[in-house]
């Protein structure tokens, strides 16, 4: 995405993650140390060169607003069942019947601006969990899962290679998954590298 947008990786990552979490231009300005005009130019350049990111975000948000859920890559539902007033302000998101009682009927689904993030994080979790099951079926048991990392005790480098292969092919995608495998006496020692 950074190459497509014509900006450095750190900036592209900040914009991407910021969009997924609903970061506004003011927050982006302070994160990147830019003034308002520089931020506007950067945002325009990013969206002109990488329009699919904003389109995907808007599509996910619309679906969450209209249907109340999204399905992850493996079909799990990410629900948006809480409601809040349409009027701008700080309001507690509530189940529909409570929200109607508290705020009236002019409501919208809460947190839908985070729909793309929920879709990506949920799909990543699906793939990691499926890889754990696939590995278990081959007799390789993970001890710990941290986000998209698995910690396993193995007997040989061949096992590490097999773990890498299973994780890369647990879900076949158009864009290949790349997995790093590291071997060490403990997870702590590997993380120090």
Protein language model features and the residues they cover:
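Conserved catalytic core of nucleotide polymerization and phosphodiester-bond processing enzymes
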Residues: 1-193
